[in-house]
Structures are given as structure tokens and as C-alpha cells.
Curated annotation (Swiss-Prot):
ATP binds at residues 14, 208-212, 283-285, 331-335. Keywords: ATP-binding, Cytoplasm, Kinase, Magnesium, Metal-binding, Nucleotide-binding, Transferase. It comes from Azobacteroides pseudotrichonymphae genomovar. CFP2. It is found in: Cytoplasm. InterPro entries: Ac/propionate_kinase (IPR004372), Aliphatic_acid_kin_short-chain (IPR000890), Aliphatic_acid_kinase_CS (IPR023865), ATPase_NBD (IPR043129). This is Acetate kinase. The keyword tRNA-binding does not apply. The gene is ackA.
């Protein structure tokens, strides 16, 4: 069975075509700068070589059509006809309270995703555009929606409710939703497979640390709490997002700077986090380089960054009444051993010990805890696209 996975962003589309029987990737790439000057499709050939194909891609339908044309082309294709694609799986960012699992897409599902646009105005519209494009271009092909938020719908109410008037929840569905759910679900399951441990009997803390970052507490296979909130701004210090902040600071800044909601949103989403505190970059690799030459703001940024992650690990150890497995994933979590080391330093009292030599491995599935560590510490490169493909396969079955 062949499954195409699409991840449609505001000006981009990432794609992977899987052969599920062979568990292999037949094609992968992405369209960039949709609706902008200089749009192009970048694809990765089986030998690893990158190819860039320029073209005028004005909207998502054109982008999806371009992708379908490439994967069936004589020069770069891997299939002869679109009829070989058995289903299309879509990443959908926000399912609100309407979806607690992946679903086959029909008119009713599309209507409900549309109703969630208020909760993710930048993400759900392009996700829908991808769905509409496939409806038009491959009308007989089943589609599946896999939601970033669905995994966290198992959180208890005392974990997802905010201390605001209850009427605001009733009117506007203001609550914690959490994100990166597909990633947390994939890496936590994969970690248990690596360790030959039952997923349904473990207390797992999953750290997805990249430009966006979140920590999730998973008990017996379900999410019980997560650091991101109603929006992806809450929680950890991220590339350009501030993370946890006293809400009173926002009104204070608005008054002092004489700015409105749009400007304050830009500050907390685009100008804060690692970039804001360091004044250097949103990329932790560049922060590491600056630390090497003694840059004080870079050192402070790294301290804030790792301290916040440690706080969440501590809090979630309490929420889970212990911890069996700690998982690192995401661009930083998978590749920056110094950050992993700094996070784990001082956590011996809860049973976390990591092997310094093994921890130096980058970007590979690795057990980095020592043999006598009570808590297993695992690095798992995330694969959200494969998880989407697995969900799609499961629903078709």
C-alpha cells in the first residue's frame, strides 16, 4: 500500500510518499514560497541528491498538483499513475475538542476543522487547502486527518483548564490543547520498542526540543499533561517564542510601548525566546558557538533554556508519580548533546544517569542512560510523517 503524507503550511507543502509494505520512503520533498516570488519544489532523490525545480506556484492547489506531477513524472517519478496512491494523510494542526484521534476525512470532518480555524488561524486554513486540493485532483482517493492536538485530548480537566472565569471556556473553548502530539506519540512508542518495554505500562516524559519545543507527560500510553497551552506560545523557551510568562507583563508592555494586540503577538511569537534573550540567533547551535567565546547573553540563554526544561521534567515526574523513560527528540533534542547533558545534570536524585560517551551520538536512535540508571534515557529522531502514514493505514484497514 502506498500512502502520500502532506503537511501544508502557510507558504509551503512538505510531502513523503511511503510504501507501507516495505516501510520505505519512495519520494520526499517540499514546495516553498507558495504565492511568493521565486517559488520552487525541492525533492530528494533515492541517492540523497537534492533537486530544485522552479515554478510559479500561486496557491496550495497548484503546489499539490506540482507534487503529484513530479512523483508520476518520467524523470523524477517513482510511480506511473496517481491510482497507485491508496490514500493521503494530512497533518492538521488544531482539532480543538472535536477530535481525539485521527479520522477519515468527509464533509462533516471538513466542517469541524473549519470551525477550529479561530484556534489556529495561521495553520488550519492551509491544512484545509491541502485537503481541498486532493478532493479536486484525486477525488476517489481516501484522505485521513491527523491532528497535532488529538493526543492531548486525554488530559484531565484539572490539567487543561486555566484559572479564568469558566464562562470564557464555555463561550470560546479557552483551555490547554497542547501541540506536537503526533511527535510525542511516535517517539514515546518507539522508545518503548527500543527498550522492549510495554507502552501501556510506562511513565514517560517526552521532550520535543526544536525551534518549537514542548514537554509531555505520558502515563500508560496516554497524555496526561503537556507544556504548550491554548497556543504554542506557552511552556518552554523556544526559538522565537517566549514560553511561560506572567500575563500581566503583556498589558504592561502594551501600555508602556503604546502598542496593540497584533504588535504584542509579534513580540511574544517572533522576537522572544532564544533570539530575544541572546540577541544573537534563534538557533541553539549558534548559541553554543557564542558560549565557546564567552558571550554572557548566550550563556544566560542556555541556562534559561535548560532550566525551564528541567522544571517541567520535575513537575511531570510528580504528575506521573515517578518516571520510567525520558525521551529527547526534535532538532535540538536529537543533535545537541551538550543541551541533553545540561538538562540531565543534577537529576540523579530521580534516577537519571546518562553515559557521557553515548550521549555524544547525534541524530540516531540511541539509549544514552547508563546501565545502572533507574530511568532509561533515549534519543529518538521524530518521524511525524511516518506516524501519519501509520494512522492512515490503520483507518483504511
Amino acid at each position: 500500500m502506498k500512502i502520500l503524507v502532506l503537511n501544508c503550511g502557510s507558504s509551503s507543502i512538505k510531502y513523503k510518499l511511503f510504501d507501507m509494505k516495505a516501510k520505505s520512503i519512495l519520494a520526499q520533498g517540499g514546495v516553498e514560497k507558495i504565492g511568493l516570488t521565486g517559488s520552487f519544489l525541492k525533492l530528494t532523490l533515492p541517492n540523497g541528491k537534492k533537486v530544485i525545480l522552479e515554478g510559479e506556484i500561486l496557491e496550495h492547489r497548484t503546489g499539490v498538483e506540482y507534487i503529484l506531477g513530479v512523483i508520476t513524472s518520467e524523470k523524477y517519478g517513482c510511480i506511473r499513475s496517481l491510482s497507485e496512491i491508496d490514500a493521503v494523510g494530512h497533518r492538521v494542526v488544531h482539532g480543538g475538542e472535536k477530535f481525539n484521534s485521527s479520522v477519515l476525512i468527509d464533509d462533516e470532518v471538513i466542517r469541524k476543522i473549519t470551525e477550529c480555524i479561530d484556534l489556529a488561524p495561521l495553520h488550519n486554513p492551509p491544512n484545509l487547502n491541502g485537503i481541498y486540493a486532493v478532493v479536486e485532483l484525486m477525488p476517489s482517493t481516501p484522505q485521513v486527518g491527523v491532528f497535532d492536538t488529538a493526543f492531548h485530548q486525554t488530559m484531565p480537566d484539572f490539567a487543561y483548564m486555566y484559572g479564568l472565569p469558566y464562562s470564557l471556556y464555555e463561550k470560546y473553548a479557552i483551555r490547554r490543547y497542547g501541540f506536537h502530539g503526533t511527535s510525542h506519540r511516535y517517539v514515546s512508542k518507539r522508545a518503548c520498542e527500543m527498550l522492549y518495554m510495554s507502552y501501556e505500562r510506562q511513565r514517560i516524559i517526552s521532550c520535543h526540543i526544536g525551534n518549537g519545543a514542548s514537554v509531555t507527560a505520558i502515563k500508560n500510553g496516554i497524555s496526561v499533561d503537556t507544556s504548550m497551552g491554548m497556543t504554542p506560545v506557552e511552556g518552554l523557551l523556544m526559538g522565537t517564542r517566549c514560553g511561560d510568562i506572567d500575563a500581566g507583563i503583556l498589558t504592561y508592555i502594551m501600555e508602556k510601548e503604546n502598542i496593540g494586540t497584533s504588535a504584542i503577538s509579534t513580540i511574544i511569537n517572533k522576537c522572544s525566546g532564544v533570539l530575544g534573550t541572546s540577541g544573537i540567533s534563534s538557533d541553539m547551535r549558534e548559541i553554543d558557538d557564542a558560549i565557546e567565546i564567552g558571550n554572557k547573553k548566550a550563556i544566560l540563554t542556555s541556562d534559561i533554556y535548560t532550566y525551564k526544561i528541567k522544571k517541567y521534567i520535575g513537575a511531570y515526574t510528580v504528575a506521573l508519580e515517578g518516571i520510567d523513560i525520558l525521551v529527547f527528540t526534535g532538532g535540538v533534542g536529537e543533535n545537541q548533546f551538550r543541551i541533553r547533558q545540561k538538562i540531565c545534570d543534577g537529576l540523579e536524585f530521580i534516577g537519571i544517569k546518562i553515559d557521557e560517551a553515548t550521549n555524544h551520538i547525534r541524530g540516531k536512535e540511541t539509549i544514552i542512560s547508563t546501565t545502572d540508571s533507574k530511568v532509561k534515557v533515549v534519543v529518538v529522531p521524530t518521524d511525524e510523517e511516518f506516524m501519519i502514514a501509520l494512522d492512515t493505514l490503520s483507518l483504511l484497514s
